[in-house]
């Protein structure tokens, strides 16, 4: 039995853009997991009807997002779960806390460890951890900053608190690397990211690039800096004449919507959890997100 859920769908998240990305990731992996085994999933009552006709899927309905941790504990305590995977944001330690719950039980976590999430989920800790090993934009310690125009007048300024950090802007191509991390690190694909004023709005998966091997190598070097990364990991990079590591995402990313592997990504995650050698073929496609 596989326990698999996505936080936006489980919590009834109201932001349509976030929910759209959540559904893209959840539906992609859910269908793959169902080809392997029975699946139990936490799904908010507003979305449960969308999945009621799925065979071999047990739905645990959520009334309120405060119930998620309680229901997660109940399932792991009372059902025979072999593997568990949650897709959730790092914000407010959501992914960290859910992973800590999974780690209390004798199941195989298909995702990253809570210790790795603690580091990779914090942009400044990530910077401190990788800056001596890979090129990354100069980043200043989070504290209160005032930002104002050089020639401004009238006392106008913006004040940012300790929840923000200031980072050097690097011009270049916005790319990402999808990897599976275990006893070995397997690059799956190099991807182009579509980013505008709305944020991440899509991409092109498994692209060709003259620096592909070098980008893979830099991503692997960065991943090796953080203990406990496991399963699917996404690394954001900026490429110009050099390769800059921007962020390490210790979780499933929306890029998997455009990623097709043989065997499936779900099967690769399970093989990885069992310390098996991975061999695979990769195809990719372009996708967009409605925001």
Curated annotation (Swiss-Prot):
Note on how the cofactor is bound: Binds 2 magnesium or manganese ions per subunit.
Pathway membership: Cofactor biosynthesis; methanofuran biosynthesis
pH curve summary: Optimum pH is 6.7.
Cofactor (UniProt): Mg(2+); Mn(2+)
Catalytic activity: tyramine + L-glutamate + ATP = gamma-L-glutamyltyramine + ADP + phosphate + H(+)
Molecular-function annotations in GO: ATP binding; ligase activity; metal ion binding
Cysteines engaged in disulfide bonds, as pairs: none
Keyword Nucleotide-binding belongs to the record: yes
Enzyme Commission numbers on file: 6.3.4.24
PROSITE patterns registered for this protein in UniProt: ATP_GRASP (PS50975), CPSASE_2 (PS00867)
Keywords: ATP-binding, Ligase, Magnesium, Manganese, Metal-binding, Nucleotide-binding
List of residues binding Mg(2+) 1: 236, 247
Residues given in the record as ATP binding sites: 131-176
Binding residue positions for Mn(2+) 2: 247, 249
Domain ATP-grasp: residue ranges: 104-274
Annotated Mg(2+) 2 binding sites: 247, 249
Binding site for Mn(2+) 1: 236, 247
Role: Catalyzes the formation of an amide bond between tyramine and the gamma carboxy group of L-glutamate. The enzyme also accepts phenylethylamine in vitro.
Protein name as catalogued: Tyramine--L-glutamate ligase
Organism for this UniProt entry: Methanocaldococcus fervens (strain DSM 4213 / JCM 15782 / AG86) (Methanococcus fervens)
């Amino acid at each position: 039995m596989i326990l698999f859920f996505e936080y936006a769908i489980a919590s009834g998240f109201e932001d349509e853009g976030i929910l759209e990305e959540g559904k893209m990731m959840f539906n992609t992996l859910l269908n793959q997991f169902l080809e392997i085994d029975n699946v139990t999933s936490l799904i908010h009552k507003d979305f449960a009807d969308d999945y009621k006709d799925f065979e071999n899927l047990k739905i645990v309905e959520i009334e309120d997002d405060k119930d998620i941790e309680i229901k997660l504990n109940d399932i792991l305590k009372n059902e025979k779960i072999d593997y568990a995977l949650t897709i959730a944001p790092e914000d407010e330690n959501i992914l960290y806390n859910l992973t800590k719950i999974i780690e209390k039980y004798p199941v195989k976590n298909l995702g990253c460890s809570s210790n790795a999430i603690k580091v990779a989920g914090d942009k400044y800790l990530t910077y401190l951890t990788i800056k001596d090993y890979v090129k990354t934009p100069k980043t200043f310690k989070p504290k209160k900053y005032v930002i104002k125009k050089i020639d401004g007048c009238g006392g106008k300024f913006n004040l940012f608190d300790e929840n923000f950090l200031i980072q050097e802007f690097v011009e270049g191509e916005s790319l990402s690397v999808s990897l599976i991390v275990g006893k070995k690190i397997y690059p799956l694909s190099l991807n182009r990211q579509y980013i505008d004023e709305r944020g991440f709005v899509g991409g092109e998966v498994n692209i060709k690039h003259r620096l592909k091997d070098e980008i893979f190598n830099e991503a692997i070097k960065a991943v090796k800096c953080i203990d406990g990364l496991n399963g699917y990991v996404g690394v954001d990079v900026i490429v110009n004449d050099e390769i800059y590591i921007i962020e390490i995402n210790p979780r499933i990313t929306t890029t998997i919507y455009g990623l097709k592997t043989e065997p499936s990504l779900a099967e690769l995650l399970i093989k990885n959890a069992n310390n098996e050698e991975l061999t695979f073929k990769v195809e990719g496609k372009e996708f967009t997100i409605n925001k």
